Amino acid sequence: MFWKWCFRLSIVFVGLWLLLDLSSRLGAEIFWFQEVGYLQVFLLRLASRGALWVVAVGVTAVYLWGNLTLAQRLKYPRSLKIAEVRREEAELSVGLKNFLSPQYSLLNAPKIHDAGHLKPFRLRWLLPLTVVFSLLAGLILVHYGKIALAYWYPAFNKNSLPIITPFRLETIWELGRQVFSQVLYLGLIVGVAIAILIYSQFFLRAIAVILSVVFGTILFHNWAKVLQYFSPTPFNSTDPLFGKDISFYIFSLPLWELLELWLMGMFLYGFIAVTLTYLLSADSLSQGIFPGFSPQQQRHLYGMAGLLMLMVAFSYWLSRYELVYSPRGVSYGASYTDVVVQLPIYNILCVLGLAIAFYLLWRTIFWRAKSQYRQFVFYGLGVYLFVVVAAGSVLPTVVQYLIVQPNELQREQPYIQRTIALTRQAFSLETIDARTFNPQGNLTTAAIQANDLTIRNIRLWDKRPLLETNRQLQQFRPYYRFPDADIDRYTLEAEAAANRPVNPNQLPAPTERRQVLIAPRELDYSAVPEQAQTWINQHLIYTHGYGFTMSPVNTAGPGGLPEYFVKDIAGSNEGALSTSSEAVRDSIPIGQPRLYYGEITNTYVMTGTKVRELDYPSGSDNAYNAYDGLGGVIIGNGWRRGLFAMYLKDWQMLFTQDFLPETKVLFRRDVKQRIQAIAPFLKFDSDPYLVAADGSPAFPGQNNYLYWIVDAYTTSDRYPYSDPDNNGINYIRNSVKVVIDAYNGSVKFYIADATDPIIATWSAIFPQMFQPLSDMPVTLRSHIRYPLDYFGIQSERLMTYHMTDTQVFYNREDQWQIPNEIYGSESRPVEPYYLITSLPTVPFEEFLLLLPYTPKQRTNLIAWLAARSDGENYGKLLLYNFPKERLVFGPEQIEARINQDPVISQQISLWNRQGSRAIQGNLLVIPIEQSLLYVEPIYLEATQNSLPTLVRVVVAYENRIVMAQTLEQALQAIFQPEVTPAPAIIRPFEEVTPPG
């Protein structure tokens, strides 16, 4: 008795704990979404998730539990003597009033005894049947459990996206092969099968309960598909196979596949569980014989088999549309074999499946104990399975090998064209403006001076050496860290670059655009000394980062160190950041430089407490601050403190004496986690970047000028005929720009591509969540840029899908690749790079993202892709193709020429032998008018205590290469009129001893 009471109390305690934990999570989420202004978004998600979970769990539990309960009533009693079954055949008629009676099996045992017409199963058939069905039950449990686990713990699945594979007749073998190849899952399946054979009643019901929760979890996490289904936006484009609008594949088909996944698993397990209940009744395995299915058992199984066959037919109906994702053939999507052979087979299997399903259901409703057509059911199912195997798998393979492959181009040509066209649509490649670029080689000093803005913004500093230098010169304390540096452009007063060379033929402009590297100085609490890592320090004192550095990309200061427009923390001036000139101070807002939200800000903190927050170091002392921003949730001294202590599992919050009524907790301060929590249906760029600008009045708050901008994407893997990338995505748009206030934590979503149907659907679902891009403050809008991740995906697809001729595509004769470059001493692919320059035929400079291409397995340039980022031209792509009959040097060829030059290679070797290391930076290919200029910086760093310095700049043009101390000197050496063009390589002016 004592142990029973202990067990009951423990159950009550665990239940209360789970209830409190769930309540705290719900309450904290409500308060947090209220803080960021997206409570309605959260409540709609919560309601839809809750409804889906209840429906899935309820329907599954009722169906499985109800059928298992009915099977318990209809099964043979354990006391039945099977040896007495073989008697004279007797008619068995049992009324429906007894069919549902709990005492059915006992009341009708004598009749069952007399059912001599039943066909018994001997042990040689009974044992394999029960083992196979038990293994299938285990396979179902493991398969759907893996899917649910991948949703619940994304890290469980290496791709973070569970692959939904429904149980279909043609995929069961493949699923079994995959699962059985893993020892853990194999052991689990075998263990489940053995448990079912020994304790069938308990484990079959237990699995039913588990599957109910599993299906609830799967539907719970697929709430987005349901909401999209009810608010679709047409693409106004149809697929070439079925003529359906693309929106059917993006919004409708995923929901039908989700329903198939759920109902197929539910009906299949229900049929298996009920069959096992009957087969294992009457102690059949011990007696070595099963008397056969009674008429009412048959009626029950007919009904369940009818529902299962209905789902099989539905599955083949869906398989028809899934042919547009077929990998068979030379191109993605439905190929010749799929359209001519596989599609008719699926149509036939769908119709046959429906016919069998309706027949089984009709027999269930209008049951006759004896029927002359009963044997036709088994024959029909046998024929159906034969058609599935023979026609569904063997015939398409034979056609592919014997008919298609000998005449592949002729057969597949129209389908290749479909793949090309729809892949280009899905990745927005069809909007690329393709032009011819024929380098003239007539660049002069006058042309260089005319493109002065381009020259002044050639990037000599890469973010890697700059960050190394920042960490040495600008971190100040161990707990500060520069996690990243980002390229951007700012409009500065002309005085900001007084030392730059001036074109005498141009009047000085009142402002100029400068390309810069901006790096936030964030707080890294993990770098705080271990002895100081106390609860108060972590959550009350070390609360925020401070300021940023901003460096021009094209100049170096004394000793080759980077110059700074913005740097330091001027402790003598109330923590203001230092600027290089008054012009910079007037051009770049530097007030309120505190970073409470950032890329590595992953701790929760409490502000407005009795403890002062560390603000910034001031000499040998520290300055302190009290947060007065709009972020955070008030917890004070009341019940909210207990709620958040439970939510954060931080019990010291309950006992600290440092809280005040106005105390607030700031959590989810990592900008990517913050926006992911608000909009999990979007994909976000891997590189948030900091902007210093005045965001008022869109962002409330006083004197705050630091904002994070993150690009967000709408993606899909269901675009018909579109060849997916390496991540499985076959549709993507950069539809949203997200802005996060670095001080207040406010988040706003702006629609950057209103033509995208997916973002239009989400905007209809959450009408108050998104704003048009025109509502973004102009000061912030001037800093949006074409995102690197999006550009990388498009440029990768373009390597193949620039070929629009089907024969050229089939032969892959014009395949491109991204060239390699030498960075440091390692060869690596060229990364896209930002540049301020003017495009050919465009009379003004603009902020571009560039990437060169070379032919497959060759090193000469074949094309370069440019993405525009300024004003009305934002988002436009231009592709410049080089003439194939002329050699245009690629990055690898220029790198080889640099390293083969005896003077340059000798100097690099000399640096590498003096306790230092020479680093060859990014090689930039820069279009200027109708010519190409190649620029590569060379850095020098010590092997210990690395502090990279810019020591040389290499410039290549046509067949000339120069290495000099500065870019201006290198350009002068190449383009000065008095130098004759005879030498292939012009040597550097002087050999300068590297800094010691």
From Swiss-Prot:
Principal location class: membrane
Topological category with respect to the lipid bilayer: Multi-pass membrane protein
NCBIfam families: PRK02509.1
Keywords, sorted A to Z: Cell membrane, Membrane, Transmembrane, Transmembrane helix
Protein name (database record): UPF0182 protein Ava_3693
Pfam family, one: UPF0182
Domain of life the protein comes from: Bacteria
Gene Ontology cellular-component annotations: extracellular region; plasma membrane
Transmembrane segments: 12-34, 51-71, 125-145, 183-203, 207-227, 261-281, 301-321, 339-359, 376-396
Cell compartments where the protein resides: Cell membrane
Homology family: Belongs to the UPF0182 family.
InterPro entries: UPF0182
